[in-house]
Amino acid sequence: MANFGPKDIKKLREMTDAGMMDCKKALTEADGDMDKAVEWLRDQGMGAAAKKAGKVAAEGAIGIKVEGHKAVIVEINSQTDFVAQNDKFKALMDTVVNHAFENNLADAEAINNSTINGEPFADFLSQQIAIIGEKLVVRRAALIVGDETTAVNGYVHSNAQNGVIIEAKCDSAKTAEAMTPVLKEVAMHAAAMAPSTLSFKDFDPKFVEDETKGRIVAIETENEELRRLGKTEKNVPQYISMSQLTDEVMAAAEEALKAELAAEGKPEKIWDKILPGKLARFISDNTTLDQEQCLLDQKFVMDDSKTVFEYVQEKAKAAGGSAEIVHFVRLEVGEGIEVEEEDFAAEVAKQMA
């Protein structure tokens, strides 16, 4: 005689999301013991997870946790965006984010090689795959751990498709406290504007060189069409990043500007008043890459009269101190993952065969 009834089967199904017949078989194997039945389903789930291993997980969500001078960000991928929106997936995200935060796990490798609730993380994730029903991958993660003079904050977009954690070094604990809400604003900016790096100093020289050539070709091509239409052509920049504006380049630019002023008949005694503005314009015209991709050089989305760098400096000064953004991490779900396009009709035919 079975030591369980329909209510037990229903309860086990609600707990695990496993099929009705699988729950009945699990309870039979466990002689009605609910915990053992869950364990039996988990063991079977490992096999189910293995079947899903070949699937591409390119959807998912981003989760963060910020507390004090510490922050963590995690990307978990699933196969469909639908799954990433369900409560079980969200609960998994909370568990993994808290696990990474509490154990100072600095990246996805550290998480995947960790132990959670007394078992290998890989086993825990396999159980979640069985419960949720799709391949799941903890793909990326990052950790910030500061001290009392470090301001830390973060932001996740409402759809959980991108998120940011960020830190700034400050001159004092008082300034760090004042700058913490400011960093929340900057994190929101970074989530929206998607900077690829903190500063032009982080660019690879080869990338800047290739990007410069590409932009020149694109503008020259566009100018051909503008000429054909009799419209004003666009300026073709020599440079696109501050990393290219060496002392020699700036000295040459200054001499060229002086020659222009002389040609315009401007008195030499007023050049010192005119040159700073013209040099600033030269820098602005020749650092478009920085303005697009460097967080510190982007126009602040909440006040585009100043850059992010200028906004942070202004807020730090108002707090009676100084602060410098030293690091940020922005993750967007699925970036960099190649997904093969499937022939839906062929897939259906394959399953019907």
Swiss-Prot record:
Belongs to the EF-Ts family. InterPro entries: EF-Ts_dimer_sf (IPR036402), Transl_elong_EFTs/EF1B (IPR001816), Transl_elong_EFTs/EF1B_dimer (IPR014039), Transl_elong_Ts_CS (IPR018101), UBA-like_sf (IPR009060). CDD domains: UBA_EF-Ts. This is Elongation factor Ts. GO terms for cellular component: cytoplasm. Its main location: cytoplasm. Transmembrane segments: none annotated. It is found in: Cytoplasm. The keyword Repeat does not apply. The keyword Transmembrane helix does not apply. It holds the Pfam family EF_TS. One of its GO terms (molecular function) is translation elongation factor activity. Associates with the EF-Tu.GDP complex and induces the exchange of GDP to GTP. It remains bound to the aminoacyl-tRNA.EF-Tu.GTP complex up to the GTP hydrolysis stage on the ribosome. Keywords: Cytoplasm, Elongation factor, Protein biosynthesis. The lineage of its organism: Bacteria, Pseudomonadati, Campylobacterota, Epsilonproteobacteria, Campylobacterales. HAMAP family: EF_Ts (MF_00050). Residues 80-83 are annotated as: Involved in Mg(2+) ion dislocation from EF-Tu.
